[in-house]
């Protein structure tokens, strides 16, 4: 978790078993499905990003393999340019289709994923 900063104050976050905390005490809980929501609590309530139906539709479409050639090429390019044991961030990862592909192709790398949609992160965390 030392790759991320607190979204409230900008201090480094420390990962704990049940979430993350910064030195100023701002804490972020880990969801049952394994992701940590780093959005500040003062945002308007509601579903940010893609909703459950949108995420499921994209997941189902991608699982049919239509974008597999693109994902495979992305993995080859990352392998060519990323150092061994690299830390790779997938910002705006959606439901994790490319994240999972890169993680499977480069098992020695640390893959981090971010998305504003809680529904997408629930699938990515699996």
Outline where the language-model segments fall.
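N-terminal auxiliary segments of SAM/dcSAM-dependent transferases
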Residues: 1-48
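Class I SAM-dependent methyltransferase Rossmann-like catalytic core
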Residues: 52-70
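Conserved alpha-helix/loop element of class I SAM-dependent methyltransferases that forms part
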Residues: 65-84
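Conserved class I S-adenosyl-L-methionine
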Residues: 85-94
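Conserved SAM-binding loop of SAM-dependent methyltransferases across substrates and taxa
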Residues: 95-107
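Short beta-strand element of Class I
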Residues: 109-112
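Conserved SAM/SAH-binding beta-strand->alpha-helix loop
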Residues: 115-119
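Conserved SAM-binding loop
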Residues: 124
């Amino acid at each position: 978790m030392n790759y991320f900063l607190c979204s409230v104050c900008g201090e480094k976050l420390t990962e704990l078993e049940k979430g993350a905390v910064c030195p100023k005490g701002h804490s972020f809980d880990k969801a049952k499905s394994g992701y940590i929501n780093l959005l500040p609590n003062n945002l308007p309530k509601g579903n940010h990003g893609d909703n459950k139906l949108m995420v499921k539709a994209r997941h189902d479409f991608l699982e049919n393999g239509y974008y597999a050639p693109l994902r495979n090429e992305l993995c080859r390019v990352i392998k060519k340019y990323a150092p061994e044991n690299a830390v790779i961030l997938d910002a705006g990862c959606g439901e994790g289709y490319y994240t999972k592909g890169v993680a499977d192709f480069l098992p020695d790398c640390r893959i981090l994923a971010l998305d504003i949609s809680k529904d997408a992160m629930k699938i990515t965390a699996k």
